[in-house]
């Protein structure tokens, strides 16, 4: 079983798909990594040689921000927005959508379950 960036990749899947189990790597980035490392995309994880795994691991370490580093960067960006006090930061602070979606009727994912207000009947 190949272990890259602290993640155990599933053995039975193609390496192109298996790399997407790493946080921060999707299909297109996975294909880019494999092309740069010179590894066939249709190879199964358990058929990879140690040299191929090393090439993939080195490319990811050198060129791609994944897992903990990426999570930390994202949370620091959100924290920076909140500290600035800009509109997006305020929306993050209040737990509301920050990209212009309507909130009168929808946005239940960000706002949480609906709380009934007494005396709000028409």
UniProtKB/Swiss-Prot annotation:
- Write out the ranges of the annotated region (Disordered): 97-122
- For whether the record's keyword set contains Transferase, the answer is no
Carries keyword Membrane? no
Q: Cellular component terms, GO, for this chain's entry?
A: cytosol; small ribosomal subunit
The record ties this protein, via InterPro entries, to: Rbsml_uS13_C (IPR027437), Ribosomal_uS13 (IPR001892), Ribosomal_uS13-like_H2TH (IPR010979), Ribosomal_uS13_bac-type (IPR019980), Ribosomal_uS13_CS (IPR018269)
Where does this protein have coiled-coil stretches?
none
- Which GO biological process categories is it annotated with? translation
The GO molecular function terms of this record are: rRNA binding; structural constituent of ribosome; tRNA binding
Question: Please, which domain of life does this record's source organism belong to?
Answer: Bacteria
**Pfam family for this entry, one:** Ribosomal_S13
Ordered alphabetically, the record's keywords are:
Ribonucleoprotein, Ribosomal protein, RNA-binding, rRNA-binding, tRNA-binding
Q: What does this protein do?
A: Located at the top of the head of the 30S subunit, it contacts several helices of the 16S rRNA. In the 70S ribosome it contacts the 23S rRNA (bridge B1a) and protein L5 of the 50S subunit (bridge B1b), connecting the 2 subunits; these bridges are implicated in subunit movement. Contacts the tRNAs in the A and P-sites.
How is this protein organized at the quaternary level? Part of the 30S ribosomal subunit. Forms a loose heterodimer with protein S19. Forms two bridges to the 50S subunit in the 70S ribosome.
Q: Which family does it belong to?
A: Belongs to the universal ribosomal protein uS13 family.
- Name recorded for this polypeptide: Small ribosomal subunit protein uS13
What species is given as this protein's source? Citrifermentans bemidjiense (strain ATCC BAA-1014 / DSM 16622 / JCM 12645 / Bem)
Cite the source lineage. Answer: Bacteria, Pseudomonadati, Thermodesulfobacteriota, Desulfuromonadia, Geobacterales
């Amino acid at each position: 079983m190949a272990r890259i960036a602290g993640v155990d990749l599933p053995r039975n899947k193609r390496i192109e798909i298996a790399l997407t189990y790493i946080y921060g790597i999707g299909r297109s980035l996975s294909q880019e990594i494999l092309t740069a490392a010179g590894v066939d995309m249709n190879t199964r994880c358990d058929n990879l040689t140690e040299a191929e795994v090393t090439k993939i691991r080195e490319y990811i370490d050198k060129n791609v921000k994944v897992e903990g580093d990426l999570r930390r960067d994202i949370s620091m960006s959100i924290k920076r927005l909140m500290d600035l006090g800009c509109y997006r930061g305020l929306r993050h602070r209040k737990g509301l959508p920050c990209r212009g979606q309507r909130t009168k009727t929808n946005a239940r994912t960000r706002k949480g379950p609906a709380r009934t207000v007494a005396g709000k009947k028409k």
